[in-house]
Amino acid sequence: MRSSILETIKDYCLVPQETTVFDGQLCAQINSAFFTLFELGCSKSPFTIEDDTSEWTDFTDNPLLLAVVPDYVQQVVRLKFDPPANSFVVNQMKDEITELTSRISYAVDPGWEVEE
């Protein structure tokens, strides 16, 4: 996985890195996903990106969140930016987003801790 958020999402959405015509639309969808993460309690303030300079570690340094947040953002953006034509695949993606949302909620819950 790339460290740049936008580059990671472009790879996942099969948009060549040199193609910049979709960057604005992708950034808007990425920011929407990050706002949902803010509402879930993943950050103390809303996080946004404007270009390919923002990295995943700019959003969080929590290893639990770094394990699931990129996948969550990829799924949400892909579903909005380029939804699959097959309804089964769409439903599968929605189910995965729901599962990732639950995992993220547990990870940020102050009453839930990983035992070492």
Which residues fall in each region the model found?
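Conserved short "hinge" loops at termini or chain/domain junctions
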Residues: 1-65, 102-116
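Short loop/turn elements at secondary-structure junctions
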Residues: 59-116
